[in-house]
Regions:
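Gly/Ser/Thr-enriched, mixed-charge loops and adjacent short helices
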Residues: 33-38, 42, 151-285, 291
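N-terminal small/polar loop signature for handling phosphorylated ligands or for N-terminal nucleophile
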Residues: 87-150, 250-311
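An N-terminal, well-structured beta->alpha segment
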Residues: 5-103, 192-229, 240
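Short Gly/Thr/Asp-enriched flexible loops that form oxyanion-binding sites at enzyme active sites
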Residues: 99-107, 150-157, 307-327, 363
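Glycine-rich phosphate-binding loop plus the immediately following alpha-helix
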Residues: 156-186, 327-350, 355-364, 420
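Phosphate-binding and adjacent anionic-ligand microenvironments
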Residues: 292, 296-298, 320-322, 340-536, ...
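Conserved phosphate/anionic-ligand binding catalytic regions in large, soluble enzymes, centered on
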Residues: 38-58, 143-146, 232, 236-248, ...
Length: 572
């Protein structure tokens, strides 16, 4: 069927709501818009769905959500998992509660019980709930930090981590088989509730989640002693973090928590930010204004689904607020956990730190200094979650901490996804420890640079939209594979890892070995002088990402090296 035929079908078929048909009638004379909405099926990728909200096959709406859920239901039934049920959560975005309910009712119509949170919750709490309730799967309706026009649908498996092989590919195949809405089952909510298939969850899971968060604290006595002297500014950026973050800080004893009023309440329109992303300085404008008014020590922002944390800290020497990258805040928490667990004799046997291949190399130096194994995985926190499962199955290591450069980390194994709630809690505990020792978080960061080296990292993203853009990205990856550079940013290329081919080629000796990681369209360059860079197309957006890192003799030296590498890699 052509896109125009599909459009006419949606306009005339009573299966679609009057509201949907009216929305489509309004674009009758706009063929470009019709084509964009109907030229393809919204792609169910390895993580799930993500797209602009609206009517059409290439949009996020109740019909595309039902279709994806029918595919998931078919897979669950094929795995004999229907008795275990599915946990469902949603964020503060437009249509999130509706999408969550539609997903639940589709599962219910397939005889699968759904445990649905009574209102918005952080993504990591869903990961926890899947494990706590013994579910076979989980669904989160969120588009993380994307602009307000977007929503999404993420799928988790029974270990509480986002789906990884073989489940991701198998679910994808089942979703692809659902080619018509006549294959999609649904039922009335009233009937589902009566049948015990639609179960509402809330406070009890919140309380258990909170207890797990607090168990990660190493020195609650230091918090009790110092908390009254620490001023914290926090913004949930109109998302799900407000209640759980404030609750865990309050229960631990932090009294001086100032929440940015304009961004406190959930609002899917994100009226104060174009892009609710804690990596973006613009997202911190209101928080930094409040920080200056109250003379805050630290400034924190969580993204709408509260799995990522952005940080600023006051440098008392200059009086200015300094931004921390995800690598920096992750390393501060990691150092604290490794140092204090070692000092208190609570470090488990065979401890392991887990990070993605594009995360800071400071982790390698840190792990070595504490005699801790460092395990590297592909980009995406789901692979860190998967690693925890492997540790438990094989009894090889004990997970201590995991982090990725994109502002996500996890202390503890109660969940299997990055958790900004535990990151806030741990960072505020680190700040308490620092305060007790007459330091700030920035002082602690300088200590890490002096101990391990001045590691700095960067990320540049190139957006290339449409069919032409996809071809360009493919061509760029092909060129880099077939014509590898000998030098980058003044650094010599020592080895090239091609994760698609599972090869690591030493350019000095010509020796080729395996990477040991699953196949992925990623190129990684090991450079001289402890530098590196990595190139990968985004899995969810029309983008190609360039990651790079250096080690300098000072902050200035590191910044200069980083700039040279960025210029050569991205701007040529």
């Amino acid at each position: 069927m052509s896109y125009m035929e599909t459009y006419r079908e949606w306009c005339s078929n009573p299966y679609f709501s009057e509201e949907t048909r009216a929305e489509l009638e309004a674009i009758r004379d706009n063929e470009a818009e019709i084509e964009d909405r109907f030229y393809r099926q919204l792609e169910f990728g390895t993580g799930g769905l993500r797209g602009v909200i609206g009517a059409g096959t290439n949009r996020m709406n109740i019909y595309t959500v039902r279709q994806a859920t029918q595919g998931l239901a078919n897979y669950i039934i094929s795995q004999n998992g229907q008795e275990k049920g599915v946990a469902i959560a949603h964020d503060s975005r437009i249509m999130s509660p509706e999408f969550a309910e539609e997903a639940a009712l589709c599962l219910n119509a397939n005889g699968i019980r759904a445990y649905v949170f009574d209102s918005l919750r952080p993504t990591p709490e869903l990961s926890f709930a899947v494990r706590e309730l013994g579910c076979v799967s989980g669904i989160v309706i969120t588009a993380s930090h994307n602009p307000r026009e977007y929503n999404g649908y993420k799928v988790y498996w029974e270990d509480g981590a986002q789906i990884t092989p073989p489940h991701d590919k198998n679910i994808l195949a089942e979703v692809a088989k659902v080619t018509s809405f006549t294959q999609v089952k649904t039922m009335e909510k009233e009937d589902a509730v009566k049948a015990g298939l639609f179960v509402t969850i809330g406070k009890e899971i919140d309380d258990r989640y909170m207890e797990e968060l607090k168990k990660q604290s190493i020195h609650p006595e230091i918090i009790k002693e110092m908390a009254k002297d620490i001023k914290i500014v926090y913004t949930p950026l109109h998302g799900t973090g407000n209640l759980p973050v404030r609750r865990v800080l309050k229960e631990l004893g932090f009294e001086n928590v100032y929440v940015v009023k304009e961004q406190e309440l959930p609002d899917g329109n994100f009226p104060t930010v174009a892009y609710p992303n804690p990596e973006s300085p613009k997202a911190f404008e209101l928080a930094l204004k409040l920080a200056k008014e109250v003379d805050a020590d630290i400034v924190l922002a969580t993204d709408p689904d509260a799995d990522r944390l952005g940080v600023y800290c006051k440098d008392t020497k200059t009086g200015e607020y300094v931004t921390f990258t995800g690598n920096m805040s992750g390393m501060l928490i990691a150092e604290y956990i490794l140092r204090e667990k070692t000092a208190t004799g609570t470090m488990p046997e065979n401890p392991a730190l887990v990070e993605t291949i594009v995360t800071t190399d400071m982790a390698k130096a840190m792990a070595a200094s504490y005699g801790v194994a460092l395990i590297e995985v592909l980009t995406g926190f789901k692979y860190i979650g998967e690693q925890i499962k492997w540790f438990e199955q094989n009894h090889s290591h004990n997970y201590v901490f995991g982090l990725e450069e994109s502002y996500g980390c996890l202390a503890g194994t109660y969940a299997r996804d990055k958790d900004a709630c535990v990151a806030v809690m741990m960072l505020c505990e680190v700040a308490s420890w620092c305060k007790k020792h007459g330091k700030t978080l920035w002082d602690a960061m300088i200590d890490l640079y002096e101990k391990y080296g001045y590691y700095r990292e960067g990320l540049s993203t190139m957006t290339l939209k449409g069919i032409d853009g996809a071809a360009q990205i493919q061509q760029m990856m092909s060129d880099m594979r077939n014509n590898p550079k000998k030098t980058l940013g003044g650094f010599e290329v020592l080895a090239v890892r091609d994760y698609k081919e599972d090869t690591r080629k030493d350019l000095k000796t010509g020796e080729v070995t395996k990477t040991g990681l699953p196949a992925s369209n990623v190129l990684y360059y090991e450079l001289s002088d402890n530098a590196w860079c990595c190139v990968r197309p985004s899995g969810t957006e029309p983008k190609i990402k360039f990651y790079y890192g250096v080690k300098g003799t000072s902050l200035q030296d590191a910044e200069e090296k980083l700039e040279a590498l960025k210029k050569d890699l991205v701007e040529e």
